[in-house]
Amino acid sequence: MKEKILKNDYFLSLISKFFVMLFGFVSLIFLNRYLGTELKGEYSSILNYVTIVSAILQFGISMVYPRFKRRNIKNCYEIFISLSMIQVALYAVVAFVVAVIYDMNVNVALICVISIIAVFTTQLRYINMVEDMKRNAFIVFIMSLCNCVITVLAFLLLESNLAIALLIYVVKDLVIISLYLTKIDYPNLFKKRYVKYYFPILREGFLPMLSGLLIMLNYKIDIIMLNSYSVDFSAIGVYSLGLSISEYMWVVPDIFKDVVQKRTAKNNPIETVNFSLRCSSSFIIIAFIVLGLLNKQLFILLFGVEFAESFNITMILLVGAYSMIYYKIIGQLFISDGKSKQYFVILLVGVVANVVINCLSIPSWGIYGASVASVVSYNGIGIVFLWLYLRYYDVNVKEVLLVKKSDFVKIKKFVKSKEKKL
């Protein structure tokens, strides 16, 4: 029975995301209390740039892995890992040379170093997610636990320091990289015949890379624009907490997105997608109601009175979080199914709308204007993805909205299955 449960990819993704959410939330509490609003605003600003830079530097390699995996290419795993290693090594050399030649700003140097590490972490994580979900779930668990323990210790033992907080972020990524590297078959890693695949991978990854960049811009452009309008770091810190809490509502959609990514490496499991959308949408609705009932006092209790206003930001952003489940799950299907152009165009329009609305709303409404811009963008993107999915795959809208009675039977039975479709 235990072996059957551990072979079920829904269960593994569920357990992995549960611990990510649990340890991550504890880390978030202590990180915000450790830094306070001003340092947290500066910390979030730096990491937002890291996220965007790393999205560019990844070049979409891990995003096209399921597509190449479906082609039954011999040593596909080794080909992608070797390319990722070469890529990161080149970035490190270029960054070092530039740092030596030019008098690089400290923040710029930090962004470069952390971005290169983040690129390798992301490549390894998503490639291994397709290859071995069980091992990937274990590694994510270890990473989340280490990050949580180190953050709590920093809060208890150290004075507030931005450099320490950034170091914790780097250590988290280094832990996950070291765990992934233990699996690699090094003697079989670099072969001359792999080179012929590198250019096709980079070519096919270019559009997904642009799409990944648009994703990050859509998530992170608000904080960058708050910076550009000289909103003080304390307000940005308040906003960043509200954004982080709203992103926790995406944990359930991410569970199903991971499973969809794994299964679309073999086929297009429409019923799996429908089931995933129903469960995710129901969860978001319940979470919104529960959080609304708990009210602002919960934020004061957990994060301190200086972060009380983050509750308002969270509730606004949750309105957009519902529609983003359609992007997260359906978007993964589109990428794996070769619909990258449609995926890209939708995200591009969403990002442009986000930027325009931010320009109009931030000068008057500050962080509330940024949250409204995000909600409009999220809803627009999600609705278009849903409409195209219903059209392309001939799915009735009733099949994706809310859980059905039959879903509870499936949920009850899935722990008894190995890897059957739900």
What are these regions (language model features)?
Residues M1-K2, L6, A109, K134-I139, ...:
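Interhelical loop/hinge segments that connect adjacent transmembrane helices in multipass membrane
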Residues K4-F59, C148, R203-S228, F233, ...:
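Signature of the first transmembrane helix
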Residues K7, P66-I73, A118-I142, A265-K266, ...:
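Membrane-interface junctions at transmembrane-helix termini in multi-pass inner-membrane proteins
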Residues D9-V20, S45-I46, V50-V106, N267-F288:
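Membrane-water interface segments that mark the loop-to-transmembrane alpha-helix transition
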Residues G24, L28-I29, L57-I73, G242-I270, ...:
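Helix-loop junctions and terminal segments of transmembrane helices
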Residues T37-K40, V98-I114, F233, L293-K328, ...:
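Interfacial segments at transmembrane-helix termini and the short loops linking adjacent helices
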Residues L47-A55, Y239-D258, A287, L317-M324:
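Transmembrane helix-bundle signature of multi-pass secondary active exporters and lipid flippases
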Residues C112-I114, I139-Y186, V349-A353, I367-R391:
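Hydrophobic alpha-helical transmembrane segments
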